[in-house]
Structure formats: C-alpha cells, structure tokens
Amino acid sequence: MLLTAMTLFCSCSNEPHPADPSAYKAQQELREKYLNLMYGEWQNEMPREDGQLKSVVNLKLNEDRTFTLVESTLTPGNNGEWTSIHEYTSEGTWSLRVVRDDNDELRPILYLKERQEGGTVGRMVDFLNVDNDVLHIDLYPFSELKRVE
C-alpha cells in the first residue's frame, strides 16, 4: 500500500507534460531569447509597382499580449501628402509559438488571435528573429518591420 501511495505521489507533479516535448522546448527557448525584444510599435511601407499607391503596415505588440495591426493603402494627394484610401485595423492577443509544419519540421510563428464579430480568427505569421531595431516576420508583402521611435 505504501508503494502504491508513493507511486501516485511521484506521478503527480506540477511540471507540464507537453504532447510534443521538442516543440515545447523550442518554444521556451524562442520566448527566452526574443520575447522582451518584441514589445513596442513596428512599421514599414512599400511603394506599389506603379508608384501611385503605397502599402503601409503598423503593428503594436503590448506587454499584456494584446496587439493592434493597421494595414493601409495610400495614394499621393495634390499637395504631396499621402492619403489613405483603404485601412484595415485588427486587434486581439498575440504570442510567440513553435508549431509543426506539413513536413513535421519545427516552425516559429507570431500568432495573432484577432477578435472579430462573432468570434476570433487566428493568423500564423512566420517569425525569423527580432533585435532592437528590426522585426523579421513574413507579414505579406513585408519581410521586416522597423521599430517606431
């Protein structure tokens, strides 16, 4: 009876038992290395091929794990200023994760869980790395965003 009690006691721990230990370990390492660098406001802009339009993205990643993403299309005005002709704003929560791709390889992502009417939508954005100045992600058509000072 003592042996049964000891076995039950030892098998119950507060340590997580992930379904995929290697992905869990990679995710912990990813967060330790990059999480504190992620917080802040990031943006980039890109002229379209015809030069008459410009795509702009602004991503704000907050420490409470909320985000605001603004994707805009601008056109030049008569006075030389760019004017927004289309703007899409999304908000929700974000996290750094590691998932398995179709080839069973580990894939680091920035996961954006967007609040929408009637529910939420998850968006997996490939994550490469981040430093104090540049966030390298695959947020089409951008491959990097620069920190806003």
Task: Annotate each language-model stretch with its function.
Residues 1-2:
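Sec-dependent signal peptide recognition
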Residues 13-24:
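Bacterial Sec signal peptide processing site at the extreme N-terminus
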